[in-house]
């Protein structure tokens, strides 16, 4: 079974875009749910189109697949608007101005910064899981 990693981002129209490293597999929508539904539809359409052209399905389709959704930072802040980008930046140890650029999609984070952000985010989630009301 193949895992298809699909990245959720903020689209230029203010909605959501989803992309992968597989050519042609994209989705979009005004909401995250719409974009995911569109992405799944395109995935099936692309497999059918490939079959029409070659009489075989793509490897990722024949072997079975699961979709792992990930966020880029613009998509993360769009999906979770109650998280303040500047405060989150301070928590994860990144310049707040740079984080706001990530949020708006003007700049993409490096692999090193993604790792740093993910590690601090995981720490934050562990801390939040201990909270009781």
Q: Where do the model's predicted regions map?
A:
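Hydrophobic micro-packing sites on short alpha-helices
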Residues: 113-118
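DNA-binding alpha-helical recognition surfaces that contact promoter or target DNA
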Residues: 37, 101, 119
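DNA-contacting interfaces and partner/effector-binding or oligomerization modules
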Residues: 1-55
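Short, charged, surface-exposed hinge/linker loops at domain edges
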Residues: 1-3, 41-103, 107-112, 126-133
